[in-house]
Amino acid sequence: MSRIGKVPIPIPDKVNVTIKGQAVTVKGPKGELSREITPEVAIEQADNLVTVTRRNESRIARQRHGLSRTLIANMVEGVSKGFEKKLQIQGVGYRAQVQGRNLILNVGYSNPVTIEPPEGVQVAVESNTNVIVSGINKEVVGNTAARIRAVRPPEPYKGKGIRYADEYVRRKVGKAGKK
């Protein structure tokens, strides 16, 4: 039995979960999310709990049991609390700004880089060097943050670039000068 899959998902008061076949729809104060869950697992709702069980003991069913439970739990958390990723920009003259919905990054290239966030994702900038990506879908928020980081990943010699707020960048010593 999957350790993650067997844990029931508690549903907060203001969240409504609808299950139609393999389609799960979660509505909450922050919005609505829908997802098709793999047919190898069965989803049941009783009182304020959603449980995910395997239909059989096949390898695929065992693999997707915990995944399906986590996807539904992330949907419930997203519509009730939301998700956010924080990024830091480090480097002389490196900065970010929001123009309309778009994020404009000045990170050492000859032209500024413009990133348009997908629907349902908000981008905010604090003090020109801190970017906050937020939304209700954990997967889309994470992908958007990764796209922003990929514009200028942190380099190991000076530490310049865009990094996650909780990321540790391993520093390297440069080559020794001539003697």
From Swiss-Prot:
Gene3D superfamilies: Ribosomal protein L6, alpha-beta domain. It comes from the Bacteria. GO terms for cellular component: cytosolic large ribosomal subunit. Keywords: Ribonucleoprotein, Ribosomal protein, RNA-binding, rRNA-binding. The keyword Ribonucleoprotein applies. Belongs to the universal ribosomal protein uL6 family. This protein binds to the 23S rRNA, and is important in its secondary structure. It is located near the subunit interface in the base of the L7/L12 stalk, and near the tRNA binding site of the peptidyltransferase center. Part of the 50S ribosomal subunit. This is Large ribosomal subunit protein uL6. The lineage of its organism: Bacteria, Bacillati, Cyanobacteriota, Cyanophyceae, Acaryochloridales.
